[in-house]
Amino acid sequence: MDNPVALITGAAHRLGAHTAKTLHQRGWNVVIHYRSRETEARDLMESLNQSRPASAVCKQGDLTQSRDVARLAEQACQHWGRLDALVNNASVFYPNPTSEATEDDWQQIMGANLKAPFFLLQHCLPALRESKGGVINLIDIYSEKPLADHPLYCASKAGLAALTRSWAKDLAPDIRVNGVSPGAILWPEGDQAVDPEHQQAILAKTPMARTGQPDDIAGAIAYLLCDAPFVTGQILSVDGGRSLNM
């Protein structure tokens, strides 16, 4: 089987799903990880398999649980007998002011955003070394300039940025490790939805004066995995220039 294989966490919807589609279009086979969005994950898998048979599979796992992380890595590496890329996209995001944050908040946010990427990569190391593969970590522009009332989230993403650079040094020359930091691409949903006034305030500080598209992120990930063999240890901000005004 000559098609490269990518494991994408949190790939049932939003940026993860767009990344799976983009890599698939470029000839990759994809392992679609999901936690609770089984219907969306299976719909995506079936759509990709219709365009290219046996090229996508979905796997469930709670990335805050160590056993699930180990199982997901094993399944991803064994399904096609190889693994060429790990995309750490899954993330937990919600406010937790310091005076109100609980140990459960710490476990959930740090577990999903920092601990899981570390140990998932650890389990995938043999396969990635064999394939001379790549790792992409989805970070955030708030890893450098924190968002108010989100100390745990910002700390987790700052930690992931540090891991990105550390791994790039430690795992070279066998494995390249880079990061992508999205700006205003898709507004948060549900309880974390951003009101229109706040959206406009963010866009007013964005030189491109608009939101980005999910394909902007997926394209950046594809570039770093497919077209940048001499790039490692870099974190690419895809934010319309927003980080210039933070």
Name every feature range the model reports, one short phrase each.
Residues 121, 156, 164:
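Active-site helix of classical SDR
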Residues 26-43:
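Conserved glycine-rich Rossmann-like NAD(P)H-binding loop of the short-chain dehydrogenase/reductase
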Residues 92, 99-118, 136, 153, ...:
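Catalytic Tyr-X3-Lys loop
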Residues 145, 222, 226, 232-246:
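Short C-terminal tail/terminal secondary-structure segment
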Residues 126, 168-173:
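Alpha-helical segment proximal to the catalytic Tyr-Lys
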Residues 172-176, 232-233:
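Short, small/polar-rich loop/turn modules that mediate ligand/substrate recognition or access, typified
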Residues 12-14:
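Conserved glycine-rich cofactor-binding loop
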Residues 97-98, 102-107, 191, 198-202:
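Substrate-binding pocket helix/loop in short-chain dehydrogenase/reductase
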